């Protein structure tokens, strides 16, 4: 049967009869070199059924190199490696003897000129793509840390990664570095726990006390003392927040301004003193059990504790100095001068609420997300600033030209209106009256919704990932702690069994002698 043309062409298709496979006319399929073939000649993967001994002639050895990575073989021309002389594969060309070859690869087959590398073949696929195409990309299913080790082994710089892959690669490396820092902070604690069972009785007693103190202060899940200590800390933070709110009542403020102190004011001061005393004791205990005092003082939560505790003592010192300098003729002039400073210092007591981050996984996740999403927060702020700078002057000009009674007196006032409008708060203190002004307001509202939605997605994914990481880390610490306790109990039980055997044999010998 002859194929019939469907496009009214006059080409003779009779030679393409299906009766035989040998009827293909060479004129219909002209021989030409494919562009893809030229591109992929730089490197190719060999199939298992390929006969390597047929291509192991002397001429092929001079032109081709066979790489065996984890059991998968690749064929590369030597000219491909000339472009990458500093890589591990490029160093093979400079090898002059068998020892030099083995210093670069793991094994070498002289008969087939085959170099063996005991490495991950999946990662080498991306390396091979870089050698033949000049594009280095990180596959989604590949571990970034393993890929970093492969890059170091093959001698390829990370700068060759494409932009999108490099961003994801560096993010994973940064997250791993943060996890290693947290594990290094916990490693001295675990090592001290293991060293606390030393042979010296005095050192063992001191180490045991420090370990129990550390468990109570830093590890709420370690036992009953840690849970009680954490509950007391949260309770005192709550009492401090309530006490700060009560101290701002109008009646107490009037008494404070008049220099008087009623029973309620005295009770508020006593509650505040007790809470500050507890926080000071907690800070002292944390400082005593810290393995590195300098690292403890540099931590953000420690700085928050200092900023929250010191205003109380500074206020006491200032009040004492004011009472000593006060004269009957001057009244409260000195207190009037430092009154603003005292009010600011007392307002810093609200930072006690940040202490809840020690016991809340959610607050820790929030802080870690804010540290990781600084770029996204910067973009959000930039978007809002550009939009505010655009809509505020435009609304000011429109309202002052077209509205009968304009409410926008200046461009800075329009800035405030733009911030409230774009964040969809809408106080309603300033409202555009003209129709063009209302159109500008609608545009600013829609722009604010869209601009805030762009970075929020990335921030949400970062928050979810950070929460999972911290939760897994917390579970890992609990498992490590449980394993340590099980190991300790097994050692103690073994020692008790040995002592029973020892003393039991001694008592039996005594009975035999008797």
Curated annotation (Swiss-Prot):
Residues 412-423, 424-431 dip into the membrane without crossing it. GO terms for molecular function: potassium channel regulator activity; voltage-gated potassium channel activity. Residues 1-224, 290-300, 360-374, 468-514 are cytoplasmic. Residues 180-205 are annotated as: Disordered. Residues 180-196 have a biased composition (Acidic residues). The chain crosses the membrane at residues 225-246, 268-289, 301-321, 339-359, 375-396, 439-467. GO terms for cellular component: voltage-gated potassium channel complex. It is found in: Cell membrane. Pfam families: BTB_2, Ion_trans. A motif (Selectivity filter) lies at residues 424-429. Keywords: Cell membrane, Ion channel, Ion transport, Membrane, Potassium, Potassium channel, Potassium transport, Transmembrane, Transmembrane helix, Transport, Voltage-gated channel. One of its GO terms (biological process) is potassium ion transport. Residues 247-267, 322-338, 397-411, 432-438 are extracellular. SUPFAM superfamilies: POZ domain, Voltage-gated potassium channels. It is a multi-pass membrane protein. The transmembrane segment S4 functions as a voltage-sensor and is characterized by a series of positively charged amino acids at every third position. Channel opening and closing is effected by a conformation change that affects the position and orientation of the voltage-sensor paddle formed by S3 and S4 within the membrane. A transmembrane electric field that is positive inside would push the positively charged S4 segment outwards, thereby opening the pore, while a field that is negative inside would pull the S4 segment inwards and close the pore. Regulatory alpha-subunit of the voltage-gated potassium (Kv) channel which, when coassembled with KCNB1 or KCNB2, can modulate their expression and their gating kinetics by acting on deactivation upon repolarization and inactivation during maintained depolarization. Potassium channel subunit that does not form functional channels by itself. Belongs to the potassium channel family. G (TC 1.A.1.2) subfamily. Kv6.1/KCNG1 sub-subfamily. Heterotetramer with KCNB1 or KCNB2. This is Voltage-gated potassium channel regulatory subunit KCNG1. The gene is Kcng1.
């Amino acid at each position: 049967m002859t194929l019939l043309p469907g496009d009214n062409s006059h080409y003779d298709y009779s030679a393409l009869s299906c009766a035989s496979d040998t009827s293909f006319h060479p004129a219909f399929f002209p021989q030409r070199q494919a562009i893809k073939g030229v591109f992929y000649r730089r490197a190719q993967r060999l199939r298992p059924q390929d006969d390597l001994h047929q291509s192991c002639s002397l001429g092929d050895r001079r032109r081709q190199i066979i790489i065996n990575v984890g059991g998968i073989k690749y064929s590369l021309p030597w000219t491909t490696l000339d472009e990458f002389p500093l890589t591990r594969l490029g160093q093979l060309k400079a090898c002059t003897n068998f020892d030099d070859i083995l210093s670069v690869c793991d094994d070498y087959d002289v008969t087939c000129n085959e170099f063996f590398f005991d490495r991950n073949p999946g990662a080498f696929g991306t390396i091979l793509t870089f050698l033949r195409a000049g594009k280095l990309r990180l596959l989604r299913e590949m571990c970034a840390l393993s890929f970093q080790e492969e890059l170091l082994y093959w001698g390829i710089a990370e700068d060759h990664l494409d932009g999108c892959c490099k961003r994801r690669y560096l993010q994973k490396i940064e997250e791993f570095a943060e996890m290693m820092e947290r594990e290094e902070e916990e490693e001295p604690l675990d090592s001290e726990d293991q060293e606390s069972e030393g042979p010296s009785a005095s050192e063992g007693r001191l180490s045991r006390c420090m370990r129990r103190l550390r468990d109570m202060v830093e590890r709420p899940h370690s036992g009953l003392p840690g849970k009680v200590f954490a509950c007391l800390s949260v309770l005192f933070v709550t009492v401090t927040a309530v006490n700060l709110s009560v101290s701002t009542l109008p009646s107490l403020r009037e008494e404070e301004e008049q220099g008087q102190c009623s029973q309620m004011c005295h009770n508020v001061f006593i509650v505040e003193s007790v809470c500050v005393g507890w926080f000071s004791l907690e800070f002292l205990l944390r400082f005593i059990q810290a393995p590195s005092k300098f690292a403890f003082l540099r931590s953000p939560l420690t700085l928050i504790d200092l900023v929250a505790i010191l205003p109380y003592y500074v206020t006491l010192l200032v009040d004492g100095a004011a009472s000593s300098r006060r004269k009957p003729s001057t009244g409260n002039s000195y207190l009037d001068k430092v009154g603003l400073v005292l009010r600011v210092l007392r307002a810093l007591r609200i930072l006690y609420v940040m202490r809840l981050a020690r016991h809340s996984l959610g607050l820790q996740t929030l802080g870690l997300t804010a540290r990781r999403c600084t770029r996204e927060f910067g973009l959000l702020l930039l978007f809002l600033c550009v939009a505010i700078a655009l809509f505020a002057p435009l609304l000011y000009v429109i309202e002052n030209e077209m509205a009968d009674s304009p409410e926008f007196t200046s461009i800075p006032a329009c800035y405030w209106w733009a911030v409230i409008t774009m964040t969809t708060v809408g106080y309603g203190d300033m409202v555009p009256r003209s129709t063009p002004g209302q159109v500008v307001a609608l545009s600013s509202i829609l722009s604010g919704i869209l601009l805030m939605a762009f970075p929020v997605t990335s921030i949400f994914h970062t928050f979810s990932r950070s929460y999972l990481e911290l939760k897994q880390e917390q579970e890992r610490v609990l498992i490590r702690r449980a394993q340590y306790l099980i190991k300790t109990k097994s050692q103690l039980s073994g020692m008790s069994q040995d002592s029973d055997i020892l003393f039991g044999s001694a008592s039996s010998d005594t009975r035999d002698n008797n």
